[in-house]
Amino acid sequence: MGLLDGKAVIITGASKGIGRALSLRFAREGAAVVCAARSADLVKETTAQVKAAGGRAVAVVCDAAREDEVRRLVAAGVKEFGKLDTLVNNAGDGGVTKPVQDYSMEDWRYTIDSCLTSSYLCTRFVVPEMIKVGGGAIVNISSGAGRRGLPYRIGYCSAKAGQVGMTYGMALELAPHNIRVNCVAPGAVEGDRIDRVIAGQAQVRGISVDEMRKAMIERSPLKRMVTADDIVDATLFFCSDMARSVSGQVLAVNAGEPAG
């Protein structure tokens, strides 16, 4: 018996990294997975990997920051699996690394839409489907940057803080419908994205990439970065019946890094 047997889940940002790891693990735990991402090639690759491992999945090419595309995403999930009762809002691009005085409106809108508007839209259109089946679980993948900040990443910090506030508000609003809403706030996650962040931070601070990476690791009491699997484990807990009485919570998965 898997922890998600009988569940039907949408996972956004399922093209690679955390999203791909979520898709593979959730399918192994018994969920039928709607893999959504902007890149057709990558999201189809994720879905192929899920199916090759014996899981159930469908790929939907979708920009989760566009209302019409999210409507189509939800309709496709219901058509394929008959219902939707779980949502992981994982989509989001960290945007550029710049001083605030150089951060353009285009930079701002892109990052807010990618990280925050996408979570709002997916939740808006999935909630009616959850109500139909008597409840569900929503997990927003935020970031430690939304709680403690990160220099030169004002759009990303703001969007991720918005996801935390959204989690609190939706948990209260949706509780009467038996819909639980929680949030996972990763620290630095090993992979291509953190490599780009480190490079950008090093450039604006005038230090080497190696120095920036060392400083980031030293900030963590456990002296390491976290992995995609660490984030998957936390998300799986929130989506499973193990967390049946847990809602409105933010779980920091950050190797012990303080929030403030």
Q: What would you call each of these model-derived segments?
A:
Residues 94-97, 148, 224, 235-236, ...:
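Short C-terminal tail/terminal secondary-structure segment
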Residues 175, 180, 246-248:
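Short, small/polar-rich loop/turn modules that mediate ligand/substrate recognition or access, typified
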Residues 29-45:
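Conserved glycine-rich Rossmann-like NAD(P)H-binding loop of the short-chain dehydrogenase/reductase
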Residues 8, 15-16, 39:
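Conserved glycine-rich cofactor-binding loop
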Residues 98-100, 104-112, 216:
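Substrate-binding pocket helix/loop in short-chain dehydrogenase/reductase
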Residues 123, 159, 167:
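Active-site helix of classical SDR
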Residues 143:
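Residue(s) in the substrate-gating loop at a strand-loop-helix junction
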